[in-house]
UniProtKB/Swiss-Prot annotation:
Membrane-topology annotation of the record: Single-pass membrane protein
SUPFAM superfamilies to which the protein is assigned, alphabetical: Eukaryotic type KH-domain (KH-domain type I) (SSF54791), HD-domain/PDEase-like (SSF109604)
Purpose: Endoribonuclease that initiates mRNA decay.
An example Gene Ontology biological process: mRNA catabolic process
Enzyme Commission number, as recorded: 3.1.-.-
Organism name: Cutibacterium acnes (strain DSM 16379 / KPA171202) (Propionibacterium acnes)
Identification of the protein by name: Ribonuclease Y
Family as reported in the entry's similarity comment: Belongs to the RNase Y family.
A GO MF term: RNA endonuclease activity
Domain KH: 229-289
Domain HD intervals: 355-449
Locations listed in the record: Cell membrane
Signal sequence, start to end: none
Basic and acidic residues biased stretches: 59-92
Amino acid sequence: MLIALIAVSVLAVAAIIGSLADRRAIGRRAERAESERDVKALELSRSQERLSRASQDLADSRKDVAKARAELESSRTRASDEARRADNADQARRSAEALLEINRRSVEELTERDHRLQEARRHLEEGLDKIEQDRLELAERSSQLDERDAELDRRHGQIVTELERVAGMSLDEARDELVEHLGREARVFAENSARAIVTEATASAEAKARHIVAEVIQRCSSEMVADTVVSVVPLPSNEMKGRVIGREGRNIRTFEQVTGVTVIIDDTPEIVLLSCFDPMRREVARQALTDLVEDGRIHPISIERAHQRAVDRIEDMCLDAAADALSRAGIDDIDDRLLPILGSLRFRTSYGQQVLDHCVECARLAANLAAEIGADIEICRRAAFLHDLGKSLTPGVEGSSHAAIGAELARRYGESEEVIHAIAAHHDEIDPVSVTDFIVKAADAISAARPGARRESLEAHVRRMDTIEEIATSFPGVVRAFALQAGREMQILVDPGAVDDHQASRLARQIALAIGEQVTVPGRTRVTVIRSFQAIETVGDA
């Protein structure tokens, strides 16, 4: 009985070993199949991972089989030993049954693992088939797209060829013409936009500026006396003319030599004219001659004494004029050494406008402008009052402008840098940078451009008008040019065939810039370009 049990056990073990051998053969075939497949996608990678896990399970199964074989061999050895040691058949039978139960469980576990391995392999094969099918579909779709692109390129070439034939130009020529057309449209649009922006900004700025200037001017009303180059000295009688002339003209020669003026005695009754371009010397001569006429004693010595007394009075008048101007301008803290220089401006004129009164008016205008726009009132008032300080020394200093001389005098007598810079920049000899600089320029322009404030000779006026018209007619396309309102307005007629509407705007801007650079015109100059086209036809008999 024991021998039969052992034989059955041996047969069972042999069957298990054979089954394991078959499973190993199947595993080797699966591995060879796996190595031949091309993994080209994410699903294949995942399938490989599942296959790897299945292979690991197979390896674990092999280890378990080996372990079971070892246990079986050990059990057989123990069974043999126990059979030899057993004294009865029951003990051997129970041992064999236990061994068979162990073997049965091992076989069931191996069978279950083999089933899982087969299932994993089946899923892997299905995934590979799907990937291959997708690859084939993608290749077919790519081929179709390539064919479609080729067809589109062919049709595009046919269309371009037909368009070139119909248009009578090549593709490059059409592109160049389109670029040129777009460029013209862009320029026209840019000019229209720029003109609209400039017009709107100018209108807004002019409205605001007119409001501010009107508010400022209505609070500043100044009397303005324009001196001439001739002073009149009344005489008590015509006999006094002979005494003024003296024996053989001795008195008049001495008077002209001492005073530096020209004495004009004509047929006009009871007056003598004193002519001189220097108002101070003319005023000294007038007072000296008035004293001589009142005294009645006219000879070279009395002429010299009267001249000295007049010079002393003029110096006192300069100090009084400076103090009065400071009071009217609202300035009280200034270096006393500047008073004689400021007072001498009482006898200086610019285009007939008295410079000292002009400085006072500028100071008041600048203070009001500063108050309107929120600038420093006192700095603007001071800079505007001193802006023409250099005119007191300009005739005696060559090679320097009155703005540069005035700035140097202001620096010498302790004025602030802001005031100095405003004085130097009020005629754009240096660039204006601060609000004070622009306010001083504006006040100077308002005072000078006010109607009746300044005048010039007819010859200079006509020459300036001719120059302005010549500048305008020098531009191509200009037919006629008319300077109006003392050069403050230009009306220009252009050839409508040579200048279109957009070029007319650009031409007006160019002419305005040229006039501003080449001619000095008080105030602003407005340039109007007129482009008129007329078509006239006649019908009927004369």
